[in-house]
Amino acid sequence: MDRFVSHFTNRLDAKGRVSIPASFRAVLARDGFEGLYVHPSIDAEAIDCGGHGLLREIDELLGRLSPYSEERDMFSTALLGTSEILKVDSEGRVVLTENVKTYAGIGSEVTFVGQGYKFQIWEPGRFRTHLEEARNRVRDLRKQLSSRPVAPDAQPPRPHGARE
């Protein structure tokens, strides 16, 4: 699978290193990125992490904005100007910099959270709070979506190969 999925909590060692979950390392290895690209999340007190897949998403976002626009400059500063490339050692560990730890409020443990093309690193307590909020919002959204009428011209999908 070429997606970051699930979540894992790991401790930092005395040197400030933390082991990236094996399934996440496997995705990074298939991606071919040397190291770990990280930047502070623009939506949460967490760190966005990934390889070429994350950089492609950032490039696509920036590509939709006018090259000299204020919006592009702001996104570029937030997503590229605050980024770091962390070295992954032979045992799959990274040293989290002080900037990273301070932004995310990280102490002795971190939670790695898969998000498809990227993953996030959270302080575990903050992640639990965020997860509870996310589940509540998804429940509310599901209720809103299920109460909407189905469009009259909407057709259910036909099985592959079915004729009209």
Curated annotation (Swiss-Prot):
Q: What is the lineage of its organism?
A: Bacteria, Pseudomonadati, Pseudomonadota, Alphaproteobacteria, Hyphomicrobiales
Task: List every stretch annotated Disordered.
Answer: 141-164
List all Pro residues biased stretches: 154-164
* GO MF term list: DNA-binding transcription factor activity; transcription cis-regulatory region binding
* Subunit field text: Forms oligomers.
Q: Pfam families recorded for this chain?
A: MraZ
Disulphide linkage map = none
Q: Which family does it belong to?
A: Belongs to the MraZ family.
Q: Which InterPro entries does the record match to this protein?
A: MraZ, MraZ_C, MraZ_dom, MraZ_N, MraZ_sf, SpoVT-AbrB_dom, SpoVT-AbrB_sf
One GO cellular component term: nucleoid
Q: Which Gene3D superfamilies match?
A: Transcriptional regulator MraZ domain
What region holds the SpoVT-AbrB domain?
Answer: 7-60, 83-126
- Organism of origin: Beijerinckia indica subsp. indica (strain ATCC 9039 / DSM 1715 / NCIMB 8712)
- What's the domain of life for this entry? Bacteria
Keyword Glycosyltransferase included in the entry's annotation: no
Q: What is its main location?
A: cytoplasm
Name one process (GO BP) from the record: negative regulation of DNA-templated transcription initiation
Compartments reported by the entry: Cytoplasm, Nucleoid
Mind listing the UniProt keywords for this protein, alphabetically?
Cytoplasm, DNA-binding, Repeat, Transcription, Transcription regulation
Protein name, as recorded: Transcriptional regulator MraZ
